[in-house]
UniProtKB/Swiss-Prot annotation:
Protein name as it appears in the record: 3-octaprenyl-4-hydroxybenzoate carboxy-lyase
Pfam families: UbiD, UbiD_C, UbiD_N
Entry's localization field: Cell membrane
Membrane-topology descriptor: Peripheral membrane protein
Amino acids binding Mn(2+): N175, E241
One GO CC term, this protein: plasma membrane
Length: 497
C-alpha cells in the first residue's frame, strides 16, 4: 500500500491547491451561518475544500469542506482514489486478526504488512509547531477562534472537528475521539460524548479511580489528515489511532506532551486546547442541527474547562457542519464504506458487497449482498453486521440480498425486496438494542429496535413454493440486435437511449 506523504495539514492543503482541490475565499464571510451556506452549496456540487481567509470579526482563517468529496478522503488516507481504500481495509482486517505466516514463502508475502506495522509507534518531540504560541489562565479566550454557528436554531457556536485526547487511569494507550463541543464561556465548552464512546469510558473509569479529582483532557484542531481520519476509521481496539495514522502516512506519528498534562497531541496540530473536566460540573447541551437533518434534544453533558491554548503561528481553524445528507460526515461514510468491506469479508467471506447509503444518515441502513449457501444464511449475516464492528451498533436496518443484486442500485434492491420477501417470514425484529441518542424516533433515548430484511432467494426449508427464475435475455439475440441497431435508427441518430 504505497502512501502519498503529508507531514501536516498545511502540506495537504498545498497539494490540494496544486490539484485544483482547494479554493481560497478572500471575501469577508461570517462564521455565523454564512460559511455553512457556502460550504453546503459547494459540497453538493462536488466542489473544492474552502479556506476562508477573512472570516468577519476574526484574524484566523477557517478551513471547511476538507473531506467534502470521496477523492479527498482517499487522498487524506494517502491513496490516489477511492478504489484503493479497499487496500486500507485489507490492512485493517489483517491487523484485527493477524494470521501467522504458514511457511517461508508466506512470510515473504506478508512482509510488506509486517513492515508497515513497524511504523506504528509514535515519535515524541520535545518542541513542536503546535506550541509556537501559548496562552493560559485569564488570557484564554475561545471567542478569538472563529467557531462556526451552523444553523439558525443552534444554541451557540460549536466546535465540530476537534480530536479529543483522553487516557483512562488503567490504560497505557490514549483514546482519540471526535465529539462536538458547545461554546458556553471564554474558557468553557460542553463535551458531548455518549456514554459508550472511548472518551466517556475513560472519564467514567477516572471518576471511579479518582473520586472528585479533575480529569485531564486535550483537544487538537487541525491535525494532519491521516490523524484526523484515523479517529473516524474502524481501528481495531488493540491499535491506537496514532499508530494507524502512522500506517496511512508511512511514517511515525509525531506527538508532543501537553504543557499542562501528560497527554500527547499531534505535534503539527494548528491549535490545541488543554484543560480538565471537573466531576459533577454539567451543563445542558443543544439543541443543534445534526447529521439526521433535524435539531436534537437538549441533554446534560460534562463541562470542559480550558486552561491553556497552544497554537502554530498563523493558525488555521478547521471546521465543518452537519445536516441532512449529503454533508461531510456522509461523504466520509461513502469513502469509509470501501474500508469496511474487506474487514467484513475476512469474518464473513460470503459477503460480496456492503453499502451504507448516504441518504440513510451514513450508518442507519446497510445493504449487504452475499453468496447464499444455506437456509437461514441471510439472518446469520444480519446478526454479524450488528455485532462484529461497533461502528454498526446503531444500524437500524440491514437488507440482505443475493449476489445478482447490485447493493448500490436502489432499483435492484427494491426489486429484490418486493419479489423475494414475505413480510412475516423474512422480516427480523430485534428489540431493546443500542440506538443512537440522536435518534428521536426510538421510544427510549439510546435504546430501540432493529429490523433485518431477508431479500434473498429462498431455499428448501424456507419455502414450500416453486421459486421464480429471473428472466434472462438470449445472448445470441442480444448480439444480433447490437449488430443491426444503428440500421434501425429508432432514435434518429442511431444511438440507444
Amino acid at each position: 500500500m504505497d502512501a502519498m506523504k503529508y507531514n501536516d495539514l498545511r502540506d495537504f492543503l498545498t497539494l490540494l491547491e496544486q490539484q485544483g482541490e482547494l479554493k481560497r475565499i478572500t471575501l469577508p464571510v461570517d462564521p455565523h451561518l454564512e460559511i455553512t451556506e457556502i460550504a453546503d452549496r459547494t459540497l453538493r456540487a462536488g466542489g473544492p475544500a474552502l479556506l476562508f481567509e477573512n472570516p468577519k470579526g476574526y484574524s484566523m482563517p477557517v478551513l471547511c469542506n476538507l473531506f467534502g468529496t470521496p477523492k479527498r478522503v482517499a487522498m487524506g488516507m494517502g491513496q490516489e482514489d477511492v478504489s484503493t481504500l479497499r487496500e486500507v481495509g485489507k490492512l485493517l482486517a489483517f491487523l484485527k486478526e493477524p494470521e501467522p505466516p504458514k511457511g517461508f514463502r508466506d512470510l515473504f508475502d506478508k512482509l510488506p504488512q509486517f513492515k508497515q506495522v513497524l511504523n506504528m509507534p509514535t515519535k515524541r518531540l520535545r518542541g513542536a509547531p503546535c506550541q509556537q504560541k501559548i496562552v493560559s489562565g485569564d488570557d484564554v479566550d475561545l471567542n478569538r477562534i472563529p467557531i462556526m454557528t451552523c444553523w439558525p436554531e443552534d444554541a451557540a457556536p460549536l466546535i465540530t472537528w476537534g480530536l479529543t485526547v483522553t487516557r483512562g487511569p488503567h490504560k497505557e494507550r490514549q483514546n482519540l475521539g471526535i465529539y462536538r463541543q458547545q461554546l458556553i464561556g471564554k474558557n468553557k465548552l460542553i463535551m458531548r460524548w455518549l456514554s459508550h464512546r472511548g472518551g466517556a469510558l475513560d472519564y467514567q473509569e477516572w471518576c471511579a479511580a479518582h473520586p472528585g479529582e479533575r480529569f485531564p483532557v486535550s483537544v487538537a484542531l487541525g491535525a494532519d489528515p491521516a490523524t484526523i481520519l484515523g479517529a473516524v476509521t474502524p481501528v481495531p481496539d488493540t491499535l491506537s489511532e496514532y499508530a494507524f495514522a502512522g500506517l496511512l502516512r508511512g511514517t511515525k506519528t509525531e506527538v508532543v506532551k501537553c504543557i499542562s498534562n501528560d497527554l500527547e497531541v499531534p505535534a503539527s496540530a494548528e491549535i490545541v486546547l488543554e484543560g480538565y473536566i471537573d466531576p459533577g460540573e454539567m451543563a445542558p447541551e443543544g439543541p443543534y442541527g445534526d447529521h439526521t437533518g433535524y435539531y436534537n434534544e437538549v441533554d446534560n453533558f460534562p463541562v470542559f474547562t480550558v486552561t491553556h491554548i497552544t497554537q502554530r503561528e498563523d493558525a488555521i481553524y478547521h471546521s465543518t457542519y452537519t445536516g441532512r445528507p449529503p454533508d461531510e460526515p456522509a461523504v466520509l461514510g461513502v469513502a469509509l464504506n470501501e474500508v469496511f468491506v474487506p474487514i467484513l469479508q475476512k469474518q464473513f467471506p460470503e459477503i460480496v458487497d456492503f453499502y451504507l447509503p448516504p441518504e440513510g444518515c451514513s450508518y442507519r441502513l446497510a445493504v449487504v449482498t452475499i453468496k447464499k449457501q444455506y437456509a437461514g444464511h441471510a439472518k446469520r449475516v444480519m446478526m454479524g453486521v450488528w455485532s462484529f464492528l461497533r461502528q454498526f451498533m446503531y444500524t437500524k436496518f440491514v437488507i440482505v440480498c443475493d449476489d445478482d443484486v447490485n447493493a448500490r442500485d436502489w432499483n435492484d434492491v427494491i426489486w429484490a425486496i418486493t419479489t423475494r420477501m414475505d413480510p412475516a417470514r423474512d422480516t427480523v425484529l430485534v428489540e431493546n438494542t443500542p440506538i443512537d441518542y440522536l435518534d428521536f424516533a426510538s421510544p427510549v433515548s439510546g435504546l430501540g429496535s432493529k429490523m433485518g430484511l431477508d431479500a434473498t432467494n429462498k431455499w428448501p426449508g424456507e419455502t414450500q413454493r416453486e421459486w421464480g427464475r429471473p428472466i434472462k435475455k438470449d445472448p445470441d439475440v442480444v448480439a444480433h440486435i447490437d449488430a443491426i441497431w444503428d440500421e434501425l435508427a429508432i432514435f434518429n441518430n442511431g444511438k440507444s437511449a
